[in-house]
Amino acid sequence: MKTRIDLTVEPRETGKHNSRGLRTSRNVPAVIYGAVTPTNVSVGEKEIVKYNTRAYENALFNLKSSDKTANGIVVLIKSVDVHPLTRRPQHVDFFALDLKKAVRVNVEVRLEGKAIGLSEGGLLNVVLRSVEVECLPTEIPEFFTADISNLAVGDALHVSDIKVSGSVKMITGAEQTIAVVNAQEEEVAAAPAAAAAPAAAAPAAKAPAAKK
């Protein structure tokens, strides 16, 4: 079963003044929505900075709170708004889950190996870095791996090459390309025809007319 991380949240009052006070005390305004009635809470800034990374992108959090409506809810961190200059978190959206109902999430695709096409002069073009899947919250994959070792020039890896199991259902189209090895185009500078050909001789000047 997917591990859950305990995260403490506390009830909060709404309004700009209250939100500003929370941020001053190094807490972040947040809202819980989804499988529950929307609930306003606050969460420690330090915790959000820690968990707002790719490593915890689809992590399940078990909320701990003095507010009975929030305590025990299992959530995903759906989004974090950050200040454009200080990069401090300003607001958090928590998505509450029903553990018995499937949810759609994006899962990172990690490429493994070195494509043989690179030694043939090809260039690797990564088209998709994540795919969308639907599954039970407890079966959300941490990431997918895709081996590109056998890709020669002109070969491609598609979504259909990713293997899924359990309740996981691929939503991204099977025909979509994840990575492809393209041939490296050679630039040939063609010399202008005028420069390649000898200049045409100028016509001879007419002799002056004889004086009578």
UniProtKB/Swiss-Prot annotation:
One of its GO terms (molecular function) is 5S rRNA binding. GO terms for biological process: translation. GO terms for cellular component: cytosolic large ribosomal subunit. It holds the Pfam family Ribosomal_L25p. Keywords: Ribonucleoprotein, Ribosomal protein, RNA-binding, rRNA-binding. Residues 1-16 have a biased composition (Basic and acidic residues). Residues 1-22 are annotated as: Disordered. SUPFAM superfamilies: Ribosomal protein L25-like (SSF50715). The keyword Zinc-finger does not apply. The keyword Lipid metabolism does not apply. Belongs to the bacterial ribosomal protein bL25 family. CTC subfamily. This is one of the proteins that binds to the 5S RNA in the ribosome where it forms part of the central protuberance. Part of the 50S ribosomal subunit; part of the 5S rRNA/L5/L18/L25 subcomplex. Contacts the 5S rRNA. Binds to the 5S rRNA independently of L5 and L18. HAMAP family: Ribosomal_bL25_CTC. This is Large ribosomal subunit protein bL25. It comes from Bdellovibrio bacteriovorus (strain ATCC 15356 / DSM 50701 / NCIMB 9529 / HD100). The gene is rplY.
